[in-house]
UniProtKB/Swiss-Prot annotation:
Its EC number is 3.2.1.52. GO terms for molecular function: beta-N-acetylhexosaminidase activity. The N-terminus is blocked. This is Beta-hexosaminidase subunit A1. The active site is at residue 308. Its main location: other. It comes from Dictyostelium discoideum. It is found in: Lysosome. Responsible for the degradation of GM2 gangliosides, and a variety of other molecules containing terminal N-acetyl hexosamines. This enzyme plays a role during the slug stage of development in the maintenance of pseudoplasmodia of normal size.
């Protein structure tokens, strides 16, 4: 009883002095603290849902195994169990942009209630519930505070870009990445699959494409891709492929040299080589390839890159230059021609195109339905949303930069504060409603499975909260203790997320950091999840 009273007053004091009383990340929209603290014992919390779902069953099993990282054999065993009752109002498991991720969570003495419209809101609620379970190392005990939470994300698109082209990232490591993203309530994995240096995606239509991979073993099969998509679905994470064209296309030409431009003066930099858009066979190739690849993903969006096109290579290639002259094309016209043809392909495969902002910078008029990902600047973002395009913000969240622009921090991990301060609407005066979210990006020139965790976490936590929590939740000083607590929690879950300030994070004696997911899906589970 004394322990419960002390904890209750600690929470009360936090409220009085203006701190956020719950160590929950991202911070919920509405929180009401109750007047009780409930002791719980390892293994005592059971989850029961009112619907049958193979997808949600994976999530329930996952969190059941995560609730209690430490045993408390020193305390007397108790037969008392606590039932977390999950009520889901719809069995529709469609996972697309704009799904309802809201949930309500009520913890009272003798009653744990989680309610959501669908399984994806329930997944967000399970993560919050996990974070509410507090471990007291001195007492070797667990407790949970009585609380009422009503929560939903600020933005429907909360993405993270993984680059598995510049360094091959094994499938199991990508599944491990999905674990970390799901814990932080990201809901979109933007998979940058192909770039100038490598083409690691297997194609049954064009098998020589993987001649552009780093190694025959450094490739992704159709089965690999579908396992990633199914695993991500168990976290409510959409997976969107990116095939970056027309620039950054050199790897396409290793297996099929007729697809790319020839420009010796530019060839010293592999990033300079674009597709040959004067050859009609190029567009037939793209059409056939994307028709094969798109069904492996369940999302309605398909990212086609479009960044850093070196048009000088087109002008140096005699065949392309002659074609442009014949057509009366400037380089902007040629780029427009390519994007128009790409729109035809997107329509045929029933996908909505995403592109980086570069085509607009070149003067290309994109299809109004195109979603524009802005990596350049806030001023470009303002012009894009003023033109009526829906947009994603990324320019402020380049995690491969250990020292982001205007960094003033001594420790590079403190750059989470810069990411945290970068609200998508900063300096946006009009049409902010066209910003539907954003993405953190981790380009992989110097990143592979060995150092991915430590370069991403805990810095990406600030981005996760910025995209989920209310705009008014923006105090670095209030966020710091919560994020510090969560980074310790991530470490206990097998994510190598380091500290932000001097403290002590108790770890399990047998904790092993692996490049593997915390759950393994069987082939039958993958099929059930993808077909629901």
């Amino acid at each position: 009883m004394i322990k419960k009273i002390i904890l209750f007053f600690a929470v009360l004091i936090a409220i009085v002095i203006g701190q956020q009383p719950l160590n929950v990340v991202p911070y919920p929209q509405q929180v009401s603290i109750g007047t009780c603290v409930i002791p719980v014992a390892p293994g005592s919390i059971l989850i029961e849902s009112n619907i049958e779902s193979a997808t949600f069953s994976v999530s329930m099993d996952r969190y059941t195994n995560l609730f209690f990282p430490f045993s408390n054999e020193s305390e007397p065993s108790s037969n008392e169990s606590f039932l977390l009752s999950v009520t889901i109002y719809s069995d529709d498991e469609t996972l697309q942009l704009g799904i309802d991720e809201s949930y309500s969570l009520s913890i009272e003495q003798g009653s744990y209630q989680l309610k959501a419209t669908n399984i994806y809101g329930a997944m967000r609620g399970l993560e919050t519930f996990k974070q509410l379970i507090v471990y007291n190392e001195l007492e070797n005990s667990y407790s949970i505070v009585c609380v009422s939470i009503s929560d939903s994300p600020r933005y429907p698109w909360r993405g993270f870009m993984v680059d598995s082209a510049r360094h091959y990232i094994p499938k199991n490591m990508i599944l491990h990445m999905i674990d970390s993203l799901g814990f932080s309530k990201f809901n979109t994995l933007h998979w940058h699959m192909v770039d100038a240096v490598a083409f690691p995606v297997e194609s049954t239509t064009y098998p020589d494409l993987t001649k552009g991979a780093f190694s025959p073993s450094a490739t992704f099969s159709h089965d690999d891709i579908q396992e990633v998509v199914a695993y991500a679905k168990t976290y409510g994470i959409r997976v969107i492929p990116e095939f970056d064209i027309p620039g950054h296309a050199a790897a396409w030409g290793i297996g099929y040299p007729e697809l790319v431009a020839t420009c010796p003066d530019y060839a010293a930099n592999v990033n300079n080589i674009p597709l040959d858009i004067s050859n009609p066979a190029t567009f037939t190739f793209i059409q056939n390839l994307f028709t094969e690849i798109a069904p492996l993903f369940i999302d309605n969006y398909f990212h086609t890159g479009g960044d850093e096109l070196v048009t000088g290579c087109w002008l140096e290639d005699p065949a392309i230059a002659n074609w442009m002259t014949k057509m009366g094309f400037s380089t902007t016209d040629a780029f427009q021609y390519f994007e128009n043809n790409l729109d035809v392909t997107m329509k045929s495969i029933n996908r909505t195109k995403i592109t980086w902002n570069d085509p607009i910078d070149y003067g290309v008029q994109l299809n109004p339905e195109t979603l524009v990902q802005v990596w350049s600047s806030g001023s470009d973002l303002q012009g894009i949303v003023n033109s009526g395009y829906k947009a994603l913000v990324s320019f402020a969240w380049y995690l491969d930069k250990q020292n982001p622009d205007n960094n003033i921090h001594y420790e590079w991990q403190d750059t989470w504060q810069d990411f945290y301060a970068a609200d998508p609407t900063n300096n946006i005066s009009t049409n902010a409603e066209n910003i539907i979210g954003g993405e953190a990006t981790m380009w992989a020139e110097q990143i592979n499975q060995v150092n991915w965790d430590v370069r991403v976490w805990p810095r990406a936590i600030g981005i996760a909260e910025r995209l989920w929590s209310a705009q008014s939740v923006n105090s670095v000083s209030l966020a710091l203790p919560r994020i510090g607590h969560f980074t310790c929690d991530l470490s206990r879950r097998g994510i190598q997320s380091g500290p932000l300030f001097p403290d002590y994070c108790p770890m399990q004696d047998d904790l092993v950091f692996t490049m593997k997911p915390n759950t393994k899906l069987s082939k039958s589970e993958i099929k059930l999840i993808l077909n629901k």
